[in-house]
């Protein structure tokens, strides 16, 4: 087959009067660019379909004037216990596990996290009693440990660690730098999409007010790594709602659909000391 054969076939069968162009993607990001497109002076007709291929109406991503990023986060804070209750919490300890099946082998990953209100945090991942990964942040410095090798946090990682080590980082958001992107849909649930930083986006349920998803981008050795975390369920612990099951999609574990982590033990106000974060 030559180039001329392909060209001749295209000119014979690819006719503009019976051509359809299918565009898939995030509607809130592509609809504005598609509307108003013209061909030979005539505006193109746009039709919308849901994820099952059924024709539907044009999605509406607009947000009413009385809704802001600040009001959405304030509603979330109230939904999980209220500012006063959250500020009383001294520490959070969480233990969980995930069952994995990779290349025909089944094993269990165990997750542990300890944070306090002094900007100190510890998280570990173990498999079969062996430490797979460890992350520590102690107020102003920290490190990641992988396969026994300790790697100090970079300046950008320290900035993220300071935010992530907070028990409830939403209490300290600077709304002058946070953008309300609009409405969206996550797992068939209508949500508000908020851009917290250039590298972090959060999604809050319009119905319940709860945060149901985070998408965070980090750069490792020049590569952009995107981690998606979806909250499947919350559990009330001493008057505070804490995520009790999450699904995480990360390049570190290239598993279709990600991994589901169930937190079997969640404790508030456990005693901590500086030695816990060495």
Model-predicted segments: where are they?
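Extracytoplasmic
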Residues: 6, 14-19, 29, 89-91, ...
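Envelope-exposed proteins and targeting segments
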Residues: 17-20, 90, 140, 176, ...
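Flexible, processing/modification-adjacent segments and terminal tails
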Residues: 65-67, 71, 78, 136-200, ...
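N-terminal mature ectodomain segment of secretory-pathway/periplasmic proteins
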Residues: 71-149, 177-185
């Amino acid at each position: 087959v030559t180039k001329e054969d392909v060209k001749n076939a295209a000119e014979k069968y690819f006719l503009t009067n019976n051509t359809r162009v299918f565009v898939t993607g995030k509607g809130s990001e592509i609809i504005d660019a598609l509307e108003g497109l013209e061909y030979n002076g005539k505006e193109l007709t746009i039709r919308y379909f849901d994820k099952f291929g059924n024709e539907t109406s044009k999605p509406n991503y607009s947000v009413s004037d009385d809704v802001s990023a600040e009001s959405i986060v304030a509603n979330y804070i109230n939904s999980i216990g209220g500012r006063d209750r959250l500020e009383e919490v001294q520490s959070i300890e969480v233990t969980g596990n995930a069952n994995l099946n990779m290349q025909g082998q089944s094993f269990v990953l165990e997750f542990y996290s300890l944070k306090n209100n002094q900007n100190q945090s510890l998280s570990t991942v173990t498999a079969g009693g062996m430490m797979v990964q460890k992350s520590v942040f102690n107020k102003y410095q920290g490190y990641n440990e992988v396969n026994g090798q300790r790697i100090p946090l970079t300046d950008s990682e320290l900035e993220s660690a300071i935010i992530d080590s907070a028990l409830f980082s939403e209490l300290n958001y600077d709304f002058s730098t946070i953008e309300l992107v609009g409405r969206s849909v996550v797992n068939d649930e209508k949500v508000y999409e908020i851009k917290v930083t250039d590298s972090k986006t959060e999604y809050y349920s319009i119905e319940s007010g709860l945060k149901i998803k985070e998408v965070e981008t980090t750069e490792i050795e020049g590569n952009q790594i995107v981690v998606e975390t979806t909250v499947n369920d919350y559990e009330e612990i001493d008057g505070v709602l804490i995520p009790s099951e999450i699904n995480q999609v990360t390049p570190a574990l290239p598993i279709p659909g990600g991994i589901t982590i169930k937190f079997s033990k969640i404790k508030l106000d456990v005693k901590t000391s500086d030695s816990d974060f060495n």
